[in-house]
Amino acid sequence: MRTGVIAKKLGMARFFDEAGVHVPVTVLSLEGCQVVAHRTKDKDGYVALQLGAGSKKPKNTSKGLRGHFAKGQVEPKAKLVEFKVSEDNLIDVGAELTADHFVPGQKVDITGTTVGKGFAGAMKRWNFGGLRATHGVSVSHRSHGSTGQRQDPGRTFPGKKMAGHYGQETVTTLNLTVWRVDAERGLILVKGAVPGTEGTFVKIRDAVKAALPADAPKPGAFRGAGAPTPVEAAADEAAPAEEPAVTEAPAAEATEAGDQA
């Protein structure tokens, strides 16, 4: 079982495949997704990787978390998430996961927090049909109707579908398809919609109901701590090489060389 990644939802876009079919995709960005700590069987009772993503100012980070990040030699992160893995899929602390951790065509499960819509009635929140338009019904056309039974049990059961806060829940969308991967810019394009608003973090992991592709990297695609990103490496290669400085001989030495000739 491999680790997942933490990505930031940038928004949606549209592309066209080779057949000219319109493909709506969600653009997800990996922003400094690093391994912060290990969870081991001996110490914690389970095996997992703690990942961090995004950046956070040290002054806005608690003292305990500052020490936690310093122990792993990573910068303070805005988001911390644990992914359970098998022992052979552990990755060194400080390593940064890259977008080619997933391969095009792979199925993934994505977890995020849905858009909050405030207080909503039962018809909007639970798709209730409402009461009749006539035949004695007045004012209560959009109400949910009865909430209980009679004297026995004499109460409303917990979990009854009623009006209340709508949205802002943790939701996992299963079996989304990875359409394209841009490892150089750290982007993952996924077919369809992903829960959450733009700018929020989501968790991406291998689909639990689909087989892992044979070409998926194990234990994952990552670069070591301190290694340059593809953009930085390309910039270094494109930079012009420094020409060696040409030093002129002093005038006295040039005159002596002319006299000897």
UniProtKB/Swiss-Prot annotation:
The keyword rRNA-binding applies. Coiled coil: none annotated. GO terms for molecular function: rRNA binding; structural constituent of ribosome. Residues 138-148, 227-261 have a biased composition (Low complexity). InterPro entries: Ribosomal_uL3 (IPR000597), Ribosomal_uL3_bac/org-type (IPR019927), Ribosomal_uL3_CS (IPR019926), Transl_B-barrel_sf (IPR009000). GO terms for biological process: translation. GO terms for cellular component: cytosolic large ribosomal subunit. It comes from the Bacteria. Disulfide bonds: none annotated. The keyword Cytoplasm does not apply. The modification N5-methylglutamine is found at residue 151. Methylated by PrmB. Residues 138-163, 214-261 are annotated as: Disordered. Keywords: Methylation, Ribonucleoprotein, Ribosomal protein, RNA-binding, rRNA-binding. Belongs to the universal ribosomal protein uL3 family. Part of the 50S ribosomal subunit. Forms a cluster with proteins L14 and L19. One of the primary rRNA binding proteins, it binds directly near the 3'-end of the 23S rRNA, where it nucleates assembly of the 50S subunit. PANTHER family: 50S RIBOSOMAL PROTEIN L3, LARGE RIBOSOMAL SUBUNIT PROTEIN UL3C. This is Large ribosomal subunit protein uL3. It comes from Phenylobacterium zucineum (strain HLK1).
